[in-house]
């Protein structure tokens, strides 16, 4: 274990400058099998401070160099992130194509992609650095970070509508950052969010509503699969078949509720509530770092699984969302507004607004924090972050956040796990 080796070495260390290498194996459960990769942790102590790097590459020592010079040589030669456990770590983005548009990942670790910490041209996978950083300042080794991503649907109706799905354990929160005016000329977009109260009331019981809705979904799924099969065979569906698909889809969707949203709105998605972001609505999303879901319906061919989960989902789904809590305003210095906009059992999110030139000392935290800029420019530890750029703030960091003089105001989101 690299951290245990580092702890024993550091306790016994009597030199002002020293270098420790630890070869270890890291499990990679995100690949779906209990595979392991061989890595080397590099710890460099100089003047009572430590720098950390990790690599899967062979390291060749130059005996003419001092420990610190050797460390910096390896970092440069192999393009490794040089991590100070007390300093913020920039998050790289990774774009994933979806049937409905694209996702932009910041902290995901899964088979489809592993996100990185970055510094200049250097990049290190998040779980690698978590495994070697002392004090769990970037989260516990082996534990995923709160999931941060952008959802960017196509502006085209139907094509850009996401899966109507629910989660049994995962909670999600969206902050709307843009409404495509091509899709929504008045600047008001939508998310499919639960079910129509009038439709529910028109049924003799909630159970009767569930069955009626399931019948509509089943009829649509049958027609959807027919069209998908014809397309896969290189055949063109007839106009009558396409018209039937549209009629069945509109009937199925008539049972659901459409919630209007505009820029800056916050949408909290509790467990078991079916939801589907609609075309042309761009959001920043924080969510529980798990990947389970049940697909209730989708107006395209589902590529990630060979079935819908409608039958099972309809039994347990919430029909209507719980009451929306109001944002909690937290004490803050002049020129700064802090709102707690999400308070889930597993994570919370604050929205912070700072006037031009304002400075804020947030203080240390018991956990890491994820920060993503909404608008304006933020200077943090000497690095400037613009809109949709993100950084992990380690738990013990106590530096200053500065709003740029160049923009009228700064707004960013700050998330932390509740643990």
Where are these regions (language model features)?
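Residue-level marker of beta-strand positions
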Residues: 19-21, 266, 272-274, 282, ...
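Active-site pocket scaffolds in enzymes
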Residues: 371-372, 389-396, 413-416
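Fold-independent oxyanion-binding glycine-rich loops
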Residues: 179, 270-272, 286, 395-396, ...
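Short, glycine-/Ser/Thr-/acidic-enriched flexible segments
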Residues: 181, 274, 291, 377-378, ...
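Short beta-strand His + acidic residue motifs that chelate non-heme Fe in jelly-roll/DSBH
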Residues: 274-279, 284-287, 360-362, 380-381, ...
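Active-site region of the double-stranded beta-helix
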Residues: 1-263, 278-375, 414
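Short acidic-glycine-tyrosine-enriched beta hairpin
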Residues: 256-268, 379-402
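Compact beta-rich and alpha/beta scaffold cores in large eukaryotic transport/transcription complexes
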Residues: 386, 406-410
């Amino acid at each position: 274990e690299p951290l245990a080796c580092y702890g024993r070495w550091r306790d016994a260390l009597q030199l002002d400058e020293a270098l420790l290498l630890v070869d270890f194996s890291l499990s990679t459960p995100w690949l779906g099998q209990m595979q392991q990769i061989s890595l080397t942790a590099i710890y460099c102590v100089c003047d009572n401070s430590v720098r950390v790097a990790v690599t899967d590459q062979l390291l060749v020592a130059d005996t003419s160099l001092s420990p610190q010079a050797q460390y910096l040589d390896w970092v440069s030669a192999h393009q490794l992130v040089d991590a100070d456990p007390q300093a913020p770590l920039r998050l790289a983005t990774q774009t994933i194509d979806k049937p409905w548009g694209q996702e932009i990942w910041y902290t995901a670790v899964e088979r489809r992609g592993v996100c990185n910490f970055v510094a200049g041209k250097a990049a290190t996978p998040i779980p690698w650095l978590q495994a070697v950083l002392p004090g769990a300042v970037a989260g516990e080794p082996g534990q995923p970070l709160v999931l941060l991503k952008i959802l960017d649907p196509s502006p085209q109706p139907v094509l850009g509508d996401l899966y109507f799905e629910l989660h049994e354990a995962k909670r999600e929160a969206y902050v709307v950052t843009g409404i495509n005016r091509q899709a929504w000329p008045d600047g008001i977009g939508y998310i499919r969010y639960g079910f129509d109260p009038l439709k529910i009331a028109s049924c003799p019981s909630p159970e009767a509503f569930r069955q009626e809705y399931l019948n509509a979904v089943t009829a649509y799924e049958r027609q959807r699969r027919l069209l998908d099969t014809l397309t896969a065979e290189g055949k063109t569906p007839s106009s009558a078949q396409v018209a039937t698909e549209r009629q069945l889809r509109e009937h199925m969707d008539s049972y659901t509720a459409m919630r209007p949203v505009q820029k800056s709105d916050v949408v909290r998605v509790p467990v078991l509530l079916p939801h589907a972001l609609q075309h042309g609505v761009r959001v920043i999303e924080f969510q529980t770092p798990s990947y389970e879901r049940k697909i209730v319906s989708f107006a395209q061919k589902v590529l990630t699984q060979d079935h819908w989960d409608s039958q099972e989902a309809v039994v347990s789904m919430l029909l209507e969302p719980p009451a929306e809590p109001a944002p909690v305003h937290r004490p803050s210095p002049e020129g700064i507004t802090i709102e707690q906009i999400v308070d889930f059992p597993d994570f919370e999110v604050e929205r912070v607004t700072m006037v031009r030139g304002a400075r804020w000392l947030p203080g240390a935290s018991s956990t890491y924090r994820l920060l993503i800029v909404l608008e304006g420019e933020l200077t943090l530890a000497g690095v400037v972050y613009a809109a949709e750029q993100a950084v992990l703030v380690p738990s013990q960091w106590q530096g200053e956040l500065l709003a740029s003089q160049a923009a009228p105001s700064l707004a960013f989101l700050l998330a932390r796990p509740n643990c």
